[in-house]
Amino acid sequence: RISYSLSGTVIEQMELFRPDVLQSFVELAKTGCVEFLSETYFHSLSFLFNKDEFERQIKEHDQKIEQYFKQKPTVFRNTELIYNNELAAFIEKMGFKGILCEGVDRLLKDRHPNQLLKPTGTKSIKALLKNYRLSDDIAFRFSDKNWSEWPLHADTFASWIHKVAGNGDVINLFMDYETFGEHQWESTGIFDFMDHLPREILKHPDFGF
Protein backbone atom coordinates (compact mmCIF):
# COMPACT_ATOMS: atom_id res chain seq x y z
CA ARG A 1 0.00 0.00 0.00
CA ILE A 2 1.21 3.49 -0.82
CA SER A 3 0.83 6.37 1.64
CA TYR A 4 1.38 10.00 0.72
CA SER A 5 2.16 12.81 3.15
CA LEU A 6 1.29 16.15 1.58
CA SER A 7 1.50 19.28 3.71
CA GLY A 8 -1.20 21.91 3.50
CA THR A 9 1.26 24.35 1.97
CA VAL A 10 2.20 22.02 -0.90
CA ILE A 11 -1.48 21.47 -1.63
CA GLU A 12 -1.91 25.25 -1.73
CA GLN A 13 0.96 25.52 -4.20
CA MET A 14 -0.65 22.89 -6.41
CA GLU A 15 -3.96 24.73 -6.22
CA LEU A 16 -2.29 27.91 -7.45
CA PHE A 17 0.30 26.67 -9.92
CA ARG A 18 -0.22 23.00 -10.81
CA PRO A 19 -3.87 21.97 -10.50
CA ASP A 20 -3.09 19.10 -12.89
CA VAL A 21 -0.71 17.61 -10.34
CA LEU A 22 -3.30 17.99 -7.60
CA GLN A 23 -5.84 16.26 -9.81
CA SER A 24 -3.42 13.37 -10.32
CA PHE A 25 -3.45 12.77 -6.56
CA VAL A 26 -7.25 12.99 -6.57
CA GLU A 27 -7.33 10.26 -9.21
CA LEU A 28 -4.94 8.14 -7.17
CA ALA A 29 -7.22 8.49 -4.14
CA LYS A 30 -10.15 7.21 -6.20
CA THR A 31 -8.33 3.92 -6.86
CA GLY A 32 -8.64 2.92 -3.21
CA CYS A 33 -5.02 1.74 -3.32
CA VAL A 34 -3.43 4.76 -1.63
CA GLU A 35 -3.95 6.63 1.60
CA PHE A 36 -3.01 10.09 2.80
CA LEU A 37 -1.26 10.65 6.11
CA SER A 38 -1.95 13.38 8.61
CA GLU A 39 0.71 15.94 9.48
CA THR A 40 1.00 19.59 10.46
CA TYR A 41 -0.39 21.99 7.88
CA PHE A 42 2.86 23.92 7.53
CA HIS A 43 5.30 20.99 7.91
CA SER A 44 6.22 22.63 11.20
CA LEU A 45 7.81 21.77 14.54
CA SER A 46 4.88 23.20 16.48
CA PHE A 47 4.54 20.24 18.89
CA LEU A 48 7.82 21.29 20.50
CA PHE A 49 6.60 24.82 21.17
CA ASN A 50 2.81 25.11 21.31
CA LYS A 51 0.52 22.09 21.50
CA ASP A 52 -2.63 24.10 20.86
CA GLU A 53 -1.12 25.39 17.62
CA PHE A 54 0.04 21.88 16.81
CA GLU A 55 -3.47 20.49 17.17
CA ARG A 56 -4.94 23.37 15.17
CA GLN A 57 -2.55 22.72 12.28
CA ILE A 58 -3.37 19.01 12.23
CA LYS A 59 -7.09 19.69 12.07
CA GLU A 60 -6.62 22.29 9.32
CA HIS A 61 -4.44 19.87 7.36
CA ASP A 62 -6.86 16.98 7.68
CA GLN A 63 -9.75 19.15 6.50
CA LYS A 64 -7.74 19.83 3.36
CA ILE A 65 -7.12 16.11 2.87
CA GLU A 66 -10.82 15.33 3.25
CA GLN A 67 -11.75 18.18 0.90
CA TYR A 68 -9.75 16.80 -2.00
CA PHE A 69 -9.23 13.12 -1.35
CA LYS A 70 -12.37 12.17 0.59
CA GLN A 71 -10.30 10.41 3.24
CA LYS A 72 -9.99 11.00 6.97
CA PRO A 73 -6.37 10.27 7.91
CA THR A 74 -5.88 7.64 10.61
CA VAL A 75 -2.07 7.63 10.75
CA PHE A 76 0.06 10.63 11.73
CA ARG A 77 3.50 11.59 10.46
CA ASN A 78 5.35 14.34 12.32
CA THR A 79 7.79 16.57 10.46
CA GLU A 80 10.99 14.64 9.62
CA LEU A 81 9.62 11.75 11.72
CA ILE A 82 10.45 13.62 14.95
CA TYR A 83 9.00 11.49 17.74
CA ASN A 84 8.69 10.84 21.45
CA ASN A 85 6.19 8.92 23.56
CA GLU A 86 4.49 12.12 24.71
CA LEU A 87 3.72 12.89 21.07
CA ALA A 88 2.28 9.40 20.55
CA ALA A 89 -0.03 9.81 23.57
CA PHE A 90 -1.16 13.23 22.34
CA ILE A 91 -1.86 11.92 18.85
CA GLU A 92 -3.77 8.94 20.25
CA LYS A 93 -6.08 11.29 22.17
CA MET A 94 -6.81 13.02 18.85
CA GLY A 95 -8.12 9.71 17.53
CA PHE A 96 -5.24 8.42 15.43
CA LYS A 97 -4.55 4.69 15.17
CA GLY A 98 -0.90 4.89 14.15
CA ILE A 99 2.15 7.14 14.15
CA LEU A 100 5.26 6.95 11.99
CA CYS A 101 8.76 7.17 13.42
CA GLU A 102 12.37 6.24 12.73
CA GLY A 103 13.58 2.71 13.41
CA VAL A 104 16.61 3.71 15.50
CA ASP A 105 18.84 0.74 16.33
CA ARG A 106 20.11 2.06 19.67
CA LEU A 107 16.53 2.52 20.90
CA LEU A 108 15.13 -0.69 19.48
CA LYS A 109 17.89 -2.81 21.06
CA ASP A 110 16.71 -6.43 20.69
CA ARG A 111 13.64 -5.47 18.67
CA HIS A 112 13.49 -4.67 14.97
CA PRO A 113 11.69 -2.05 12.84
CA ASN A 114 9.39 -4.59 11.20
CA GLN A 115 7.36 -5.00 14.39
CA LEU A 116 4.27 -3.02 15.32
CA LEU A 117 5.03 -1.46 18.70
CA LYS A 118 2.78 0.14 21.33
CA PRO A 119 4.43 3.28 22.68
CA THR A 120 4.84 3.59 26.45
CA GLY A 121 1.98 5.57 27.99
CA THR A 122 -0.56 4.78 25.27
CA LYS A 123 -3.53 2.42 25.09
CA SER A 124 -3.71 1.06 21.56
CA ILE A 125 -1.97 3.32 19.05
CA LYS A 126 0.74 1.57 17.04
CA ALA A 127 4.16 2.93 16.11
CA LEU A 128 5.05 2.20 12.49
CA LEU A 129 8.82 2.22 12.23
CA LYS A 130 10.90 3.03 9.20
CA ASN A 131 13.16 0.25 7.95
CA TYR A 132 15.94 2.69 7.18
CA ARG A 133 18.29 0.18 5.58
CA LEU A 134 15.83 -0.95 2.92
CA SER A 135 14.49 2.59 2.51
CA ASP A 136 17.96 4.00 1.94
CA ASP A 137 18.77 1.25 -0.57
CA ILE A 138 16.21 2.90 -2.83
CA ALA A 139 16.46 6.53 -1.75
CA PHE A 140 20.25 6.88 -1.71
CA ARG A 141 22.11 3.81 -2.93
CA PHE A 142 20.02 2.84 -5.96
CA SER A 143 22.19 4.65 -8.53
CA ASP A 144 25.52 4.38 -6.71
CA LYS A 145 27.77 2.46 -9.08
CA ASN A 146 30.24 1.83 -6.25
CA TRP A 147 27.59 -0.01 -4.23
CA SER A 148 28.12 -3.77 -4.14
CA GLU A 149 24.45 -4.36 -5.05
CA TRP A 150 24.39 -2.04 -8.07
CA PRO A 151 22.51 -2.35 -10.34
CA LEU A 152 19.57 -3.16 -8.07
CA HIS A 153 16.64 -5.00 -9.65
CA ALA A 154 13.13 -5.40 -8.28
CA ASP A 155 13.40 -9.17 -7.88
CA THR A 156 16.58 -8.80 -5.83
CA PHE A 157 15.05 -6.18 -3.56
CA ALA A 158 11.91 -8.28 -3.14
CA SER A 159 14.07 -11.24 -2.09
CA TRP A 160 15.53 -9.12 0.73
CA ILE A 161 12.01 -8.26 1.87
CA HIS A 162 10.93 -11.90 1.68
CA LYS A 163 13.65 -12.84 4.17
CA VAL A 164 11.54 -11.14 6.85
CA ALA A 165 8.72 -13.68 6.36
CA GLY A 166 7.56 -14.99 9.72
CA ASN A 167 9.66 -12.50 11.65
CA GLY A 168 7.74 -9.26 11.51
CA ASP A 169 4.39 -7.53 11.01
CA VAL A 170 5.09 -4.95 8.33
CA ILE A 171 7.98 -3.46 6.36
CA ASN A 172 7.78 0.30 6.09
CA LEU A 173 9.75 2.01 3.34
CA PHE A 174 9.82 5.78 3.90
CA MET A 175 11.43 8.16 1.43
CA ASP A 176 11.04 11.69 0.17
CA TYR A 177 8.95 12.20 -2.94
CA GLU A 178 11.95 13.84 -4.56
CA THR A 179 13.69 10.45 -4.51
CA PHE A 180 11.90 9.69 -7.76
CA GLY A 181 13.18 11.85 -10.58
CA GLU A 182 15.48 14.15 -8.61
CA HIS A 183 17.71 12.15 -6.27
CA GLN A 184 17.31 9.18 -8.59
CA TRP A 185 16.91 10.39 -12.16
CA GLU A 186 14.72 8.59 -14.65
CA SER A 187 17.85 7.43 -16.47
CA THR A 188 18.81 5.31 -13.43
CA GLY A 189 15.84 3.03 -14.08
CA ILE A 190 14.08 3.97 -10.83
CA PHE A 191 10.64 4.16 -12.42
CA ASP A 192 10.93 0.74 -14.03
CA PHE A 193 12.16 -0.61 -10.70
CA MET A 194 9.12 0.74 -8.86
CA ASP A 195 6.78 -0.49 -11.59
CA HIS A 196 8.00 -4.07 -11.13
CA LEU A 197 8.42 -4.06 -7.35
CA PRO A 198 4.83 -4.77 -6.20
CA ARG A 199 4.42 -7.84 -8.40
CA GLU A 200 7.80 -9.17 -7.27
CA ILE A 201 6.84 -8.74 -3.62
CA LEU A 202 3.49 -10.47 -4.20
CA LYS A 203 5.20 -13.58 -5.57
CA HIS A 204 5.65 -14.68 -1.94
CA PRO A 205 2.35 -15.97 -0.47
CA ASP A 206 2.98 -14.39 2.95
CA PHE A 207 3.19 -10.84 1.61
CA GLY A 208 0.69 -8.16 0.63
CA PHE A 209 1.35 -4.74 -0.81
Residue positions per predicted region:
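Catalytic alpha-helical scaffold of carbohydrate-active enzymes acting on polysaccharides/glycoconjugates
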Residues: 1-74, 81-136, 143, 151-167, ...
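Glycine-rich, aromatic-lined ligand/substrate-binding cores of catalytic
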Residues: 176-190, 194-200
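Short conserved micro-motifs at the rims of enzyme active sites and ligand-binding pockets
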Residues: 138-144, 183-186
